[in-house]
């Protein structure tokens, strides 16, 4: 422990008193532990165990008398232990079904070890809904969905009896209610204890689940649950589109003229270490960047709290709608703002949110659509239960009343309560705070702060978006190459080399004109374009309806001047025979100078094409990417301005390709972007022509060029396209890419009505 920290605790005890440090004999059999402030009073000791085991007890706290405070086996109380209970790692087990109506399950055990399965079968005339086989996971929870045997005879479907719960209520018609409780007092019920069959045939509230006190959620489960509510809120743009599908449940439709208020509440109380608070901040930053990458109007509030809340950013500020300002404010949030406050006052931080809402309503007018159409999402990140102030549930009630949250306005408020760590997280309190909606979960407990960061890194999976929102790739760690660049397509015109292209709408592909050099264009109906991953079920072949090649392209145009190949106007369009269904494997990239790209860049509606070029290519060295034949995303640096002039000089020095060239501009016109000056720059291979040259801005991707030609082929002579050779000594590699900013007139001529273009 740091000397200054030890001195702080001595001073806290007052003059003449000595701090009593706690006993260090606190090891756990089969596990480890961490200390928040060494062995001094106030320090928190947290135990951890290998996957599939849990610590008992979970934690201890060093008191001022030098004794350890140890929790009861119950998840709701603590006591001062008269003797030290030996800490051990115990095996995790999953709860057994307490009842299964109209069917059987097997094997029948009191509880189930990690790795075991339980199977469900229905009686005759009943149909199984949910998972027929469920697997006991290392976090103490079953995978899959609750198995239910139903005959469909009632107004609402049989709500089932989830594992570990007991239900009263056998009728499922309109107005009927069912009630749930846990079959053991040691368990904690999350979800709705009471549900009512509604006129729309859906049960009110959310499915109740009983959990062991030591159970927790995996990051992928939480990310999936958040996606259900947030992905479609951010991606849906057509208010008349029917988005209700069985797999996704509820959808929030927000028009481009609508608005989302996002409130991020970060716990900074004493039980949160400064390191974990920094992870809270990083997670919030990831959330902000992801949400601002979608095409909706967003205001973000940031509030840190311990004994009292501190507003870092208010939704009432214009700055709350600027992603840069929001992230700057997040960075400025300091753990030390609350260093003298030891409590966790969740009520006060929620009342601060209520006050913001009240002020905004007063400003906009209670009866105006500007106020009524705002959606509100609250995300509470905490590592413990509220231990001071009024009941947080009362604050939630006031918020719901202010927003008039009733059955027909339930979609206008989502509250996510995320507990981090197993120190003193109160399942009951989290469940009371989280929203209750059919098919969704809003209360979670994660094992640690690192798991929280994983959620925000992997959330908002675009595979669920059904409209043609452009330039969105799946950046999660487990995404495939095609999911990261879903606009990438490949095709092979007859006997020519494979070429690449980019999906720019649901039916049009942009590529290079030289892919069609010396072939019979009337045979285009025989070509096949591979969209999606051609090596998996997600890949599909499309026929070509039409080919449009820039009329100025002629590879032999300057042969008489001693220039064997000339690639000006090296651009073409393919119209597919049918529209591509949007998915995580197939989605268009954003083309600059279009309305879609303008919204993705979050620029004002009055922006111009020149504004886009300035924003995307203003630096003399611009990091960008292209996609290799094997699907890998490779890196280049585009050169502009004076650096472009330096970059193209290598052409005149290459006497093997251009033996008599005296003026570089005869070969490299201002249509071309240049790369290859950096040693770490990748060089495209033959067969990668026509692919997108693109760059990213806040999780959205924009095509600024397409691969055209180069001075060095790193794959020449190699049958393995995964191996790229370095250029031999004396050879200066350079690559040239058609700039989409220079061929705007041609693009507008042929894509008018397909894409909405901005003024030049």
From Swiss-Prot:
Q: Does the keyword Protease apply?
A: yes
Q: Where is this motif: MIDAS-like motif?
A: 267-271
Signal peptide per UniProt: 1-18
Regions annotated as coiled coil: none
Which of this chain's residues are annotated to bind Mg(2+)?
A: 269, 271, 344
Q: Which residues are glycosylated?
A: 27, 32, 117, 297, 340, 474, 478, 663
Domain VWFA as annotated: residue spans: 261-459
Instruction: Name the cystine pairs.
Output: 22-62, 49-89, 94-136, 122-149, 156-197, 182-210, 470-590, 499-515, 593-609, 647-674, 685-715
Instruction: Describe the processing and modification events after translation.
Output: Cleaved and activated by different proteases depending on the complement pathway to generate complement C2a and serine protease complement C2b chains. Cleaved and activated by C1S following activation by the classical complement system. Cleaved and activated by MASP2 following activation by the lectin complement system. Cleaved and activated by GZMK following activation by the GZMK complement system.
Which keywords, in A-to-Z order, does the entry hold?
Complement pathway, Disulfide bond, Glycoprotein, Hydrolase, Immunity, Innate immunity, Magnesium, Manganese, Metal-binding, Protease, Repeat, Secreted, Serine protease, Signal, Sushi
Q: Where in the cell is it found?
A: Secreted; Cell surface
Where are the active-site residues found?
514 (charge relay system), 570 (charge relay system), 689 (charge relay system)
> Which residue numbers delimit the Peptidase S1 domain?
471-752
Q: What CDD domains does the database record attribute to this sequence?
A: CCP, Tryp_SPc
Look up the domain of life of the source. Eukaryota
Query: Which cofactors must be present for this protein to function?
Result: Mg(2+); Mn(2+)
**Molecular-function annotations in GO:** metal ion binding; serine-type endopeptidase activity
One biological process term from GO is: response to lipopolysaccharide
Residue span, Sushi domain:
20-90, 92-151, 154-212
* Listed EC numbers: 3.4.21.43
Task: Please give the family membership noted in the entry.
Answer: Belongs to the peptidase S1 family.
**Protein role:** Precursor of the catalytic component of the C3 and C5 convertase complexes, which are part of the complement pathway, a cascade of proteins that leads to phagocytosis and breakdown of pathogens and signaling that strengthens the adaptive immune system. Component C2 is part of the classical, lectin and GZMK complement systems.
Record remark: domains: The MIDAS-like motif in the VWFA domain binds divalent metal cations.
User: What's the protein name?
Assistant: Complement C2
Q: What species is given as this protein's source?
A: Mus musculus (Mouse)
Q: Which gene does this sequence derive from?
A: C2
């Amino acid at each position: 422990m740091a000397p200054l920290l030890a001195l702080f605790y001595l001073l806290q005890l007052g003059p003449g008193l000595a701090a009593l440090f706690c006993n260090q004999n606190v090891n756990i059999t089969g596990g480890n532990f961490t200390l928040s402030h060494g062995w001094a009073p106030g320090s928190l000791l947290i135990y951890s165990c290998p996957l599939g085991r849990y610590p008992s007890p979970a934690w201890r706290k060093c008191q001022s008398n030098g004794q350890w405070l140890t929790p009861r086996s119950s998840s709701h109380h603590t006591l001062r232990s008269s003797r030290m209970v030996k800490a051990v790692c115990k095996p995790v087990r999953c709860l057994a079904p307490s009842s299964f109506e109209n069917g059987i399950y097997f094997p029948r055990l009191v509880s189930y070890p990690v790795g075991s399965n339980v199977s469900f079968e229905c009686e005759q005339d009943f149909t199984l809904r949910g998972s027929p086989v469920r697997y006991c996971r290392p976090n103490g929870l079953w995978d899959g969905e609750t198995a239910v045997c139903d005959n469909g005879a009632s107004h609402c479907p049989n709500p089932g009896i989830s594992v570990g719960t007991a239900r009263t209520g056998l009728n499922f018609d309109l107005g009927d209610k069912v009630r749930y409780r846990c079959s053991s007092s040691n368990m904690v019920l999350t979800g709705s204890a009471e549900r009512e069959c509604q006129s729309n045939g859906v049960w009110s509230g959310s499915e109740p689940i009983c959990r062991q006190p030591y159970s927790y959620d995996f990051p992928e489960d939480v990310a999936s649950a958040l996606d259900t509510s947030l992905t479609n809120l951010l991606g849906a743009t057509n208010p008349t589109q029917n988005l209700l599908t069985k797999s996704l449940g509820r959808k929030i439709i927000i028009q481009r003229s609508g608005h989302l208020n996002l409130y991020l509440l970060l716990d900074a109380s004493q039980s949160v270490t400064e390191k974990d608070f920094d992870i809270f901040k990083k997670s919030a930053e990831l959330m902000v960047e992801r949400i601002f990458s979608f095409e909706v109007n967003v205001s973000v509030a940031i509030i840190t709290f311990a004994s009292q809340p501190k507003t870092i950013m208010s939704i009432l500020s214009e700055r709350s709608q600027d992603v840069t300002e929001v992230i700057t404010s997040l960075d400025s949030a300091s753990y030390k703002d609350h260093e003298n406050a030891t409590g966790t006052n969740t009520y006060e931080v929620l009342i601060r949110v209520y006050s913001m809402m009240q002020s905004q309503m007063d400003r906009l007018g209670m009866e105006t659509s500007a106020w009524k159409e705002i959606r509100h999402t609250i995300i509470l990140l905490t590592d413990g239960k509220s231990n001071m102030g009024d009941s947080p549930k009362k604050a939630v009630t006031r918020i719901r009343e202010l927003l008039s949250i009733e059955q027909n306005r339930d979609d206008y408020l989502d509250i996510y309560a995320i507990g981090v760590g197993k120190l003193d997280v109160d399942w009951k309190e989290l469940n009371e705070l989280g929203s209750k909606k059919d098919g969704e979960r809003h209360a979670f407990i994660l094992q640690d702060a690192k798991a929280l960061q994983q959620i925000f890194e992997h959330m908002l999976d675009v595979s669920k978006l059904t409209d043609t929102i452009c330039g969105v790739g799946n950046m999660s760690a487990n995404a495939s190459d095609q999911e990261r660049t879903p606009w990438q397509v490949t095709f092979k015109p007859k006997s020519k080399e494979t070429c690449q292209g980019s999906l720019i709408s649901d039916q049009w592909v942009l590529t290079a004109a030289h892919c069609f050099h010396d072939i019979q264009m009337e045979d285009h109906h025989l070509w096949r374009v591979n969209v999606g991953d051609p090596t998996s079920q997600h890949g599909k072949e499309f026929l070509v309806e039409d080919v449009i090649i820039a009329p100025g392209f002629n590879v032999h145009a300057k042969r008489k001047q001693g220039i064997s190949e000339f690639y000006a106007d090296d651009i073409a369009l393919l119209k597919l025979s049918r529209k591509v269904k949007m998915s995580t494997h197939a989605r268009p990239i954003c083309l600059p100078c279009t309305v879609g790209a303008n919204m993705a860049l979050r620029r004002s509606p009055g922006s111009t094409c020149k504004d886009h070029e300035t924003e995307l290519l203003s630096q003399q060295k611009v990091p960008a990417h292209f996609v290799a034949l094997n699907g890998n995303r490779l890196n280049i640096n585009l050169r502009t301005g004076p650096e472009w002039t330096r970059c193209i000089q290598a052409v005149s020095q290459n006497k093997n390709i251009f033996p008599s060239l005296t003026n570089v501009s005869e070969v490299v016109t201002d249509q071309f972007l240049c790369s290859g000056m950096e040693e770490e720059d990748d060089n495209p291979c033959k067969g990668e022509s026509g692919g997108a040259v693109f760059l990213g801005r806040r999780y959205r991707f924009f095509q600024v060029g397409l691969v055209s030609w180069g001075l060095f082929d790193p794959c020449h002579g190699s049958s393995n396209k995964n191996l790229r050779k370095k250029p031999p000594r004396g050879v200066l590699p350079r690559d040239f890419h058609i700039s989409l900013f220079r061929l705007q007139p041609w693009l507008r001529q042929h894509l008018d009505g397909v894409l909405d273009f901005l003024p030049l």
